[in-house]
Amino acid sequence: MLRLDLQFFSTKKGQGSSKNGRDSESKRLGSKRADGQFVSGGSILYRQRGTKIYPGENVGRGGDDTLFSKIDGVVKFERYGRNRKKVSVYPVAKEA
């Protein structure tokens, strides 16, 4: 008598093999301080990629284009030319 060894292979993938389910962690870019807000020196004002907003008075630009305050003062977001923006920090007048 002839014996046949038949094997059936699955035609569907098993459960749990989703190709979705990955996403990069958010970089938390954008404004960190509001217009008119008091900041101390070294405070981060704006996190960005590239120069969406330019540094103005008393504001420095880090290696990753982060804008930070160089002095204690009040934040001011301003227009710079036709289609540019800048952020400046102005010292607060001391009361006598």
From Swiss-Prot:
Q: What GO terms in the biological process aspect are recorded for it? A: translation
Here the segments flagged for biased composition (Basic and acidic residues) are 20-35
What are the GO cellular component annotations? Answer: cytosolic large ribosomal subunit
- What does the PTM comment of the record read? The N-terminus is cleaved by ribosomal processing cysteine protease Prp.
Region of interest (Disordered), residue spans: 1-36
The record's keywords, sorted A to Z, are: Ribonucleoprotein, Ribosomal protein
* Xref: SUPFAM superfamilies: Ribosomal L27 protein-like
Specify residue ranges for compositional bias: Polar residues.
Answer: 8-19
State the protein's name: Large ribosomal subunit protein bL27
Provide the species name: Oceanobacillus iheyensis (strain DSM 14371 / CIP 107618 / JCM 11309 / KCTC 3954 / HTE831)
